[in-house]
C-alpha cells in the first residue's frame, strides 16, 4: 500500500509522541520556534553522532572544533556578512505583508509545475520584472501591489556590555563556518596536520529569515553540521567530487530512499561570487524538493579575507616541498534539523495488517532510533526480572521500559516511535533465562538468551 505522507501527519506524530513541540507553547508559542522533546532530543543527537562518526571519527583527515557563537564584529565584516548577507524583500501595499521576492517566484513556478530550479542570483530588477509580468499575487491577501525589491540583512544584532552603541555591537552567528576559518592556524599548529585536512563543527546558527516555514525545515534558530576541508589549490575539484559522493552515500547508508534524493548543480548565475562550484543534495519532502546539504568549492576566499582584514598570515607552508600557499576550501554544509526531518518523513509508514488491523511505524535506521530496544514485561508480576534486564541493557543503549496496557498496544506504541526491537519478559524467562525479541519492521519474533542480548542488539544497530 502506498502511504500518503503529509506534513500534517508528520507534525502530529512528532508532537503526540514527544519528538518536537511548538516553542513557548503555554504562552501562545513563538512563530517558527520548535523544541525537541524527550524522544526528539535522543533522535537528533543520534543524527549528529552518526555524522560525527563518519566525518570525524572515521576520517583520517578531519578534526573537530566548537567555536563561540558570539564573535568579534570584524569577523563578519571580513566574511562579507555585514555588507552582503541579505534577502530580497517586497512589501504588499494592500495588507502590509512582507515577502521574499525569490520565494514568491519559486512558489509560483512550483504551483505551475514548471521545471524551474531557483531565482538565486537574480538582481532586484529581474525579480520585480518577473513578478509584475506574471502578475504574481501576495500569498496573504491575493492582491498584486508590491513595493520595489530591497535587501534586508539576515543577521540578529545585539550588544555586548552595558552600553548599546556601535562599539559594543555584535551578532549571533549566521553560520558556523567562520569560527573554523579564524581557528585555521590554531588547528594546524596544535594538531601538526598536513594538507589536506578538515575541521568539523556542529552548532547553532541564527538567521532572521522573513519567510520561515514548513515545520523545522526553515527556522530562525537552527543547527548546522559543517566541514571545512582545506586542500592544495589545483586539487580542489577532485576533493569537491569526493565530498559530494561521500555526503550522498552517508544519507543512503542511513536509509534515505534514493528515489527521494537528487543532486542539483548550481547554474553559473546562482553561484556565490567566491564559489568555483556548488551542488545541493535535495530531498523530496511532502511540500516539494528542499535542500539538505550544500557542497561548495569556496576556493581561498575566506582565508584570504580574514588574512587581509586581520593582518595575520594564514598561509600554509608545505613541509615536504617548502611551498607556501593559501589552501582552497571545500565545504559540505548540512542542516541537522533539516536532515532529521527528512529521516522522519522517509521513515514514516502506515501498514495494513491481517484481520483488518493497521499500524503506524517509523522505520528509522536503528542507529538513529531514540530507543534501541524496549523492555516489556508480559505482566506486572514480572517487573523485577524486567528491570534487571533494563538495568543491564541501559549501560550500553538507550532503552525504554513499558508495562502499561496489552502487549499488542505496547508493540504499536514502540512501532510508532521507531524502536527497532521489543524484548518481552514472560514466565519462561524465569525458568530458562530467555526472552522473546521482536523485530519492528518484519514483526518476526525469536527466542534468545538474556546473556546474548547485548551482542545481538549491538550488531543490529551498528553503523
Swiss-Prot record:
Tell me the superkingdom of the source: Bacteria
User: Which PROSITE patterns does this entry report, sorted A to Z?
Assistant: AA_TRNA_LIGASE_II
- Entry EC number(s): 6.1.1.14
Instruction: Please state what class of enzyme this protein is.
Output: ligase
Q: Does the keyword Nucleotide-binding apply?
A: yes
Q: Which UniProt keywords apply?
A: Aminoacyl-tRNA synthetase, ATP-binding, Cytoplasm, Ligase, Nucleotide-binding, Protein biosynthesis
Q: Which residues bind ATP?
A: 207-209, 217-222, 291-292, 335-338
What quaternary structure, including any partners, is listed in this protein's UniProt entry? Homodimer.
Q: What does this protein do?
A: Catalyzes the attachment of glycine to tRNA(Gly).
Q: What is this protein called?
A: Glycine--tRNA ligase
Amino acid at each position: 500500500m502506498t502511504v500518503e505522507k503529509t506534513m500534517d501527519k508528520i507534525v502530529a506524530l512528532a508532537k503526540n509522541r514527544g519528538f518536537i513541540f511548538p516553542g513557548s507553547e503555554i504562552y501562545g508559542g513563538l512563530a517558527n520556534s520548535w523544541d525537541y522533546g524527550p524522544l526528539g532530543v535522543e533522535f537528533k543527537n543520534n543524527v549528529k553522532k552518526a555524522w560525527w562518526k563518519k566525518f570525524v571519527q572515521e576520517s583520517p583527515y578531519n578534526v573537530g572544533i566548537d567555536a563561540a557563537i558570539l564573535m568579534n564584529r570584524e569577523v563578519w565584516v571580513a566574511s562579507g556578512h555585514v555588507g552582503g548577507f541579505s534577502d530580497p524583500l517586497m512589501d504588499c501595499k494592500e495588507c502590509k505583508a512582507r515577502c521574499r521576492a525569490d520565494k514568491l517566484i519559486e512558489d509560483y513556478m512550483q504551483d505551475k509545475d514548471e521545471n524551474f530550479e531557483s531565482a538565486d542570483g537574480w538582481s532586484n530588477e529581474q525579480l520585480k520584472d518577473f513578478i509584475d509580468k506574471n502578475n504574481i499575487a501576495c500569498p496573504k491577501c491575493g492582491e498584486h501591489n508590491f513595493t520595489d525589491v530591497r535587501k534586508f540583512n539576515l543577521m540578529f544584532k545585539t550588544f555586548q556590555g552595558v552600553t548599546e552603541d556601535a562599539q559594543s555591537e555584535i551578532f549571533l552567528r549566521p553560520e558556523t563556518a567562520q569560527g573554523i576559518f579564524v581557528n585555521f592556524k590554531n588547528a594546524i599548529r596544535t594538531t601538526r596536520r598536513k594538507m589536506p585536512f578538515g575541521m568539523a563543527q556542529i552548532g547553532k546558527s541564527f538567521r532572521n529569515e522573513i519567510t520561515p516555514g514548513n515545520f523545522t525545515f526553515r527556522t530562525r534558530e537552527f543547527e548546522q553540521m559543517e566541514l571545512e576541508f582545506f586542500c592544495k589549490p589545483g586539487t580542489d575539484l577532485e576533493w569537491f567530487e569526493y565530498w559530494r559522493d561521500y555526503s550522498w552515500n552517508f544519507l543512503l547508508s542511513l536509509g534515505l530512499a534514493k528515489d527521494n534524493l537528487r543532486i542539483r548543480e548550481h547554474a553559473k548565475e546562482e553561484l556565490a561570487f567566491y564559489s568555483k562550484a556548488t551542488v545541493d543534495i535535495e530531498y523530496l519532502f511532502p511540500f516539494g524538493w528542499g535542500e539538505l546539504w550544500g557542497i561548495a568549492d569556496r576556493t581561498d576566499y575566506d582565508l584570504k579575507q580574514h588574512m587581509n582584514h586581520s593582518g595575520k598570515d594564514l598561509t600554509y607552508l608545505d613541509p615536504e616541498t617548502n611551498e607556501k600557499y593559501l589552501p582552497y576550501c571545500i565545504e559540505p554544509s548540512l542542516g541537522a534539523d533539516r536532515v532529521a526531518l527528512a529521516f522522519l518523513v522517509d521513515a514514516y509508514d502506515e501498514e495494513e495488517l491481517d484481520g483488518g488491523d493497521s499500524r503506524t511505524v517509523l522505520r528509522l535506521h536503528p542507529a538513529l532510533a531514540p530507543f534501541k530496544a524496549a523492555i516489556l514485561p508480559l505482566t506486572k508480576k514480572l517487573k523485577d526480572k524486567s528491570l534487571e534486564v533494563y538495568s543491564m541493557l541501559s549501560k550500553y543503549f538507550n532503552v525504554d521500559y513499558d508495562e502499561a496496557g496489552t502487549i499488542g498496544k505496547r508493540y504499536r506504541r514502540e512501532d510508532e516511535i521507531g524502536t527497532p526491537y521489543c524484548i518481552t519478559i514472560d514466565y519462561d524467562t524465569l525458568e530458562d533465562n530467555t526472552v522473546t525479541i521482536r523485530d519492528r519492521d518484519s514483526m518476526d519474533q525469536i527466542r534468545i538468551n538474556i546473556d546474548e542480548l547485548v551482542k545481538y542488539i549491538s550488531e543490529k544497530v551498528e553503523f
